[in-house]
Amino acid sequence: LNLYKLRSKIEILNLSNEFVVASISKEKFLGLKNTKNEEGYTIKFRQDPIFLDPRSSKLGARLIINLEKLYLSIKKLNLKPEDPIKYYELSHKLGIPQIGCEKLKDKIFGIECNFEELNGIDFKKGCYVGQENTARIKLKNKISKRLLPFKVIDGKIKINEDIYFENE
């Protein structure tokens, strides 16, 4: 991230040893006090933020919890741990890939990964790496490829295998 701060007078710290990110259902989030059904809406729970996922509320809410308070927060929220694979499967079904994307690095623009639809691109502010290309693609309405979810009805698909729709 330090590469992207340009000349801003900010410090970026790695706090991954102090905090953990967890997810709860949208229904559980809306059952908490002072919540709203708005993507990105944030509340504080014991000083830690809980927010409705800004990419899609179907993903539920995200919690950023201090590791020292994790067990107590889970208990107070009446949560039970689940297999994170379920979360990633739901994410992929919604067209929001989060794992297994390493091969796409430097080969695809954010706009081709649906970042605009996922509230990840703002065409009104700031500059960022790839902004010129992204703006040109948007302006000319020329998205030549797009990352989309699909359901395999029969069989299995191998990496780099061609996929056809109605033999085309």
Residue ranges of model-derived segments:
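Basic, glycine/lysine-rich polyanion-binding surfaces/domains
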Residues: L1-E168
